[in-house]
A protein has these predicted regions:
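N-terminal transmembrane alpha-helices
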Residues: 7-45, 58-73, 81, 102-109, ...
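Helix-terminus/linker motif at the lipid-water interface of multi-pass membrane proteins
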Residues: 32-50, 120-127, 183-190, 251, ...
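Short alpha-helical transmembrane segments in multi-pass integral membrane proteins
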Residues: 1-23, 78-143, 189-247, 305-371, ...
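Short runs within selected transmembrane alpha-helices of multi-pass transporters and secretion channels
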Residues: 71, 140-158, 166-174, 195-211, ...
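Transmembrane helical elements of multi-pass membrane transporters/channels
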Residues: 18-37, 139, 150, 173, ...
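Residue-level hotspots within pore-lining transmembrane alpha-helices
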Residues: 25, 29, 33, 63-67, ...
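Small-residue-rich hydrophobic transmembrane alpha-helices
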Residues: 50-110, 147-166, 279-341, 375-397
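Hydrophobic transmembrane alpha-helices of multi-pass small-molecule transporters
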Residues: 62-65, 109, 177-181, 207-211, ...
């Protein structure tokens, strides 16, 4: 189950490929997880159901983002401890990361479950979509914690040297999701309840697989029993705060997708009604796939960069960074070309050509796809700063990208360009973020030359 990986001495290109291939495949299975839901909901229930799922999606993104935050923070700290031979400290940190993230998501799920009606309205649901939104939330909110466990556990399994097992967690979860989606929606006719329950059960399987690995099969790192003394609890809180600091940008990256969906739902329903939201939901199903691939590239580079940064090997850090940037940009250009050429086929996967939302989506998605190229550079830049413990800088970049520039795009461009401006809001945010990263890069170089 354990793969032969040496972060400190193996050739960087070989090491990166060894991590990248299973990580990308795992993310592809996660993407299948997302796409399957969209296809079954759109074809089996209808475009209104597709719009309703998109309205609830920010909650899923936030839970996953919490998992990513503690996964990044915990794995960066643990990587550096392992490079220094401090295995016990690494074990304590990954355990604290799992405990913290699980507790936060459980509290969030309970609060959301108690207020599903008002929450649906707050997320931007119209009166027509609200019953579908509520039904979906009731059946997936209790299982949100397994989304978090799957997201957090992936980092620690890869850090332990088992990227193939991490891939299998996502793959098996996706397979179960596909099977349950077909049975619950088409065979049993359970509608929104079936779609939510199928996704939840698939995630339960994946989440439990990560926990089983960390408790039974891990080699280098293990879950460590946390003491309940006041001193131990204070230390846990301190370490948790530090992990949050390092991983905040990872959370904001995921939350920015939630922000994009939230703002987009409001703007689209204002300009184009429920059909506009249904069209936008197709882009939102496609966007996380792009995010997952870029995230896989960043996650593959992260343990290499963190380990060698902690070991004082800057040349290996630079090689890993340059390799990640080249890989991401190639993917970004490819995704844009595929989106532009295959937009009708992509949209027809989710809804019938007779739906009013079909033409809206086909006309808008090429505008939306422009941002994929800039998104690639941004994800690697953010991941790099996380990996070298520059969490504050990564957080600033992510906040600008996911909130400030997104708000500017959604509320300014539609006034200037009309409907195309709504679709171009996200690409504008990505472009401005890329320009900001280039700016601080040259500023850093200028400061170094002055010294």
């Amino acid at each position: 189950m354990k793969d032969s990986i040496d972060f400190g001495s193996m050739d960087i290109s070989m090491l990166f490929r060894k991590l990248l291939v299973p990580t990308v495949l795992g993310m592809v299975f996660s993407a299948i997880f997302v796409i399957t839901d969209g296809i079954f909901v759109g074809k089996g229930i209808g475009s209104d159901a597709l719009a309703a799922v998109n309205i609830t999606a920010p909650l899923f993104m936030i839970a996953t983002g919490i998992g990513l935050m503690f996964g990044v923070g915990g794995s960066v700290v643990a990587s550096i401890y392992l490079s220094q031979g401090k295995r016990k400290a690494a074990n304590i940190n990954i355990t604290q990361a799992l405990v913290f993230s699980t507790f936060i998501v459980l509290v969030m799920s309970a609060l959301c479950f108690c207020f599903v009606g008002p929450l649906g309205c707050l997320l931007g649901s119209s009166d027509r979509l609200l019953p579908l939104v509520i039904e979906y939330m009731i059946w997936y909110l209790p299982f949100l914690v397994f989304y978090e466990l799957l997201s957090t556990g992936m980092f620690f399994i890869r850090l332990d040297g088992s990227p193939n097992y991490a891939m299998m967690c996502n793959a098996i979860a996706a397979i179960f999701n596909i099977i349950f989606d077909y049975i619950f929606i088409f065979e049993f006719g359970w509608g929104m309840m079936g779609a939510a329950f199928a996704t939840s059960l698939g995630t339960v399987v994946g989440g439990l697989m990560t926990v089983i690995y960390l408790t039974r099969f891990s080699r280098n790192i293990h879950l460590h029993r946390i003491k309940l003394s006041l001193k131990s609890l204070m230390l846990t809180l301190r370490n948790g705060g530090y992990m949050i600091k390092l991983g905040t940008s990872a959370f904001i990256s995921e939350a920015s997708i939630a922000c994009m969906m939230f703002l987009g739902n409001y703007v689209f329903i204002h300009h184009l009604g429920e059909d506009g939201v249904a069209a936008f939901s197709i882009a939102c199903y496609f966007f996380p796939i792009i995010f997952m691939v870029y995230n896989a590239i960043a996650q593959s580079a992260q343990p290499i960069i963190s380990y060698n940064f902690g070991a004082g090997q800057p040349d290996r850090v630079r090689k890993a960074l340059h390799l990640a940037i080249r890989t991401a940009l190639i993917c970004g250009i490819s995704f844009f070309i595929i989106t532009f050429l295959c937009r009708q086929n992509i949209v027809s996967l989710f809804i019938d050509r007779s739906c009013p939302a079909f033409d809206i989506a086909v006309n808008g998605i090429p505008y939306f796809g422009v941002g994929f190229i800039f998104f690639a550079a941004n994800m690697i830049g953010i991941g790099y700063y996380q990996s070298i413990r520059r969490g504050q800088r990564a957080t600033i970049i992510t906040l600008l990208r996911g909130v400030v520039f997104m708000l500017i795009g959604f509320f300014v461009l539609p006034l200037v360009l009309g409907v195309p401006g709504i679709w171009l809001a996200v690409p504008l945010a990505e472009l401005l973020t890329t320009l900001y990263i280039i700016g601080i890069y040259f500023k850093d170089r200028f400061m170094i030359h002055r010294l």
